[in-house]
């Protein structure tokens, strides 16, 4: 027994611990017979079974059957090969070495590969232990791809469409102050000592209260200088010539007389001072 342990310990500390835990106190002949029979128990893969077999037909045996079953019923490639799983390459990378020693020891806590053949286990090209882990990963990747390829919501599209309008509004608002500054400069250029020039070139910013044009105002001023009060016939003629109503002509003359009286009071006040 000690000679057998020293021989098995040359494959490494992991295989030595594994052999001590599994072998127990059985005789060397039993294990020799089992290890000799193992390479001849290679069962070819059924050609009728595809990679996309139905998972509903799989009936897993309890774990107690793994330890109590004979070593001859378990394919050595499924137990001793390193845990490197390839979906399309099974029969070349997991063969034991020529001197009878096995390259790696697989932990019993890991999922059993599809090479292990039990009575109630249906052989398939895929590993049932890794299948439940692959599906959630694929779902997560699909969700990530869908989130990246998902188009923008309607709120972002509307906000992007409103950007040009907002830019135009800001541009128009920036032009308004420059226009007002231009008006102020023109008003400053007017001569304060020449009221006639100020009246002709004046541009009030507030809404105009009368529809009179410059030509109409000039003709009314001429008529006022000639006669401060108009008769009904003369008022009718002036309204017809200037395309105004008699009421408009009457109101203009009333306002003009009030303005003249105000100017006269200011002049008289300056003379008394």
From Swiss-Prot:
GO biological process: anterior/posterior pattern specification; DNA-templated transcription; embryonic skeletal system morphogenesis; proximal/distal pattern formation
Feature: DNA-binding region: 205-264
Listed CDD domains: homeodomain
Major location (coarse): nucleus
GO molecular function: DNA-binding transcription factor activity, RNA polymerase II-specific; RNA polymerase II cis-regulatory region sequence-specific DNA binding
This protein's GO CC annotations: nucleus
InterPro entries: Abd-B_homeobox_TF, HD, HD_metazoa, Homeobox_CS, Homeodomain-like_sf, Hox9_activation_N, HXA9/HXB9/HXC9
Positions of region (Disordered): 169-197
Domain of life of the native organism: Eukaryota
SMART domains reported in the protein's UniProt record: HOX
Basic and acidic residues bias: start-end ranges: 169-188
Annotated localization: Nucleus
Keywords: Developmental protein, DNA-binding, Homeobox, Nucleus, Transcription, Transcription regulation
Record family assignment: Belongs to the Abd-B homeobox family.
Functional summary from the UniProt entry: Sequence-specific transcription factor which is part of a developmental regulatory system that provides cells with specific positional identities on the anterior-posterior axis.
Protein name from the UniProt record: Homeobox protein Hox-D9a
Organism, as annotated: Takifugu rubripes
């Amino acid at each position: 027994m000690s000679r057998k342990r020293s021989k098995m310990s040359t494959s490494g500390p992991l295989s030595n611990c594994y052999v001590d835990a599994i072998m127990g106190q059985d005789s060397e002949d039993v294990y020799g017979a089992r290890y000799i029979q193992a390479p001849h128990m290679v069962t070819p893969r059924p050609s009728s079974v595809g990679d996309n077999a139905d998972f509903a037909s799989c009936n897993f045996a309890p774990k107690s059957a793994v330890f109590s079953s004979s070593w001859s019923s378990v394919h050595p490639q499924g137990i001793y090969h390193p845990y490197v799983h390839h979906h399309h390459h099974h029969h070349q990378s997991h063969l034991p070495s020529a001197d009878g020693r096995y390259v790696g020891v697989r932990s019993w806590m890991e999922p059993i590969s599809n090479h292990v053949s039990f009575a109630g286990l249906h052989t398939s090209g895929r590993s049932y232990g890794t299948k439940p882990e692959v599906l959630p990963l694929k779902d997560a990747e699909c969700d990530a791809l869908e989130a990246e390829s998902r188009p923008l919501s309607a709120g972002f599209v509307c906000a992007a469409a409103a950007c040009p309008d907002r830019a135009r509004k800001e541009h128009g608002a920036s032009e308004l102050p420059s226009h007002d500054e231009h008006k102020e400069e023109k008003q400053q250029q007017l001569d304060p000592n020449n009221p006639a020039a100020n009246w002709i070139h004046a541009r009030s910013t507030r809404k105009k209260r009368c529809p009179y044009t410059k030509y109409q105002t000039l003709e009314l001023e001429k008529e006022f200088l000639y006669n401060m009060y108009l008769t009904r016939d003369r008022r009718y003629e002036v309204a017809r010539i200037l395309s105004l109503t008699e009421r408009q002509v009457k109101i203009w003359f009333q306002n003009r007389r009030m303005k003249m009286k105000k100017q006269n009071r200011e002049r008289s006040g300056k003379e008394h001072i």
